[in-house]
Amino acid sequence: MPIKSFASRLALSLAICGTAMGQKVNGADYNKPDGGPPAKFFQASSSIPVAAIQAAAAKASKVPSHATYPIGQGSTKSTIHSDWAGFSEGAAFSFIADMDVDCDGLNHGCKGNPDGQKETNWGALSAYEVPFIVIPQEFLDANKGTLKGNAVAAVICNGKMFYGIFGDSNGDSPQVTGEASWLMARTCFPKEDLNGNKGHTAADVTYIVFTGDKAVLPSSALNKNYITNFDTLRSMGDSLVGALAKNLNLGGGGGNPPTTLTTTSIPEPTGGSGSCSWPGHCAGATCSSNDDCSDDLTCQNGKCASDGSAETCSWEGHCKGATCSSNDDCSDELACISGICSVDNGVETCEWEGHCEGASCSSHDDCDGNLACKNGKCSA
């Protein structure tokens, strides 16, 4: 897409999220296996070209030393690539692997993890509250000059991008790649009931860990146990990924995405038959939600199409047609119906965020108001 369009979409999305959500939190409130921070706290802006970045990572080929590891006992191997490590902004290592669950730290006794360790590399993080990833210790030792503890990381899973931090290392024998905290793993794959002894086995997850001191989440947003300001995590993540996208020339035919984020207006559609400001997302393109479509197009039956009655939406990426696991994943008055954000005139309000209809539960006490726990989900 043209640079102005990318900048406008990204800037507006950040402005909406930053002012409307304000995720400064008391981490202990979310230190629960089924009550961690909701996905919206650490999901990338919908303006980030997630699919294009994932495709670029799949083409990476530069292999540094100490970079190849199995993804499990006796399994295939994954290689950490350094194609992006030399950029002046948005520098990062990347790799593709599966996703096992790491509960080291505060929650070392999580389900399926009887032998967890009480500490993580730079503290004792809560695996229930902090979305973090794990890197093999040998690779960390070989790259201590660039890989920093608590550096921002991005994970692409199930077609979505989530931000976290590089919070722990793997010193097992053999050392493996493809490991993330309880929160990150269960956010990526909410229907798989992942735990310390059950991981996502397909090697289809893209991991990106940013390098250098400027990529480290500051102490104002993090303590030894919890992330305390998710706004900072999201803002840094979008900025770093925006810089990476620019370096990879992923802005589309008209230019590159910006490295600095400023508030600008979304340009009006150019009008006319066949006009479209976001190449690849025009009428007829495949889509999963309205946010996959350019300008005023909407996602109808999996295809971007014109719809003069398109509704407004204050939370980009969570509009009508977006995938969801609970009502809290949907904007405004939309409800999560059969995994899709949809209009429901009978939607009831929910006062306990993360415990609304569709949320995971183990008992009725995990559900808001008059909802009940049925088959592991809060239901009316």
Swiss-Prot record:
Quoted from the entry, the domain comment is: The C-terminal R3 domain contains 3 tandem repeats required for the binding to insoluble chitosan.
Q: Which UniProt keywords apply?
A: Carbohydrate metabolism, Glycosidase, Hydrolase, Polysaccharide degradation, Repeat, Secreted, Signal
Q: Name one GO cellular component term.
A: extracellular region
Mention any Pfam family matching this sequence.
Glyco_hydro_75
Protein's recorded name: Endo-chitosanase C
Taxonomic classification: Eukaryota, Fungi, Dikarya, Ascomycota, Pezizomycotina
State the R repeat positions: 276-304, 311-341, 348-378
Summarize the temperature dependence annotation.
Optimum temperature is 50 degrees Celsius.
Coarse class of the protein's main subcellular location: secreted
Q: Per the UniProt entry, what is one GO biological process?
A: polysaccharide catabolic process
Under which main EC class is this enzyme filed? hydrolase
GO MF annotations in UniProt: chitosanase activity
Cysteine-cysteine disulfides:
none
Q: Where in the cell is it found?
A: Secreted
* Signal peptide from the UniProt entry: 1-22
The EC code for this enzyme is 3.2.1.132
What this protein is reported to do is described as: Chitosanase catalyzing the endo-type cleavage of chitosan, the deacylated form of chitin. Chitosanase may be crucial in the degradation of the deacetylated portion of chitin in the fungal cell wall. Chitoolisaccharides produced by the hydrolysis of partially N-acetylated chitosan are known to have many biological activities, including antibacterial activity, immune-enhancing effects, and elicitor activity.
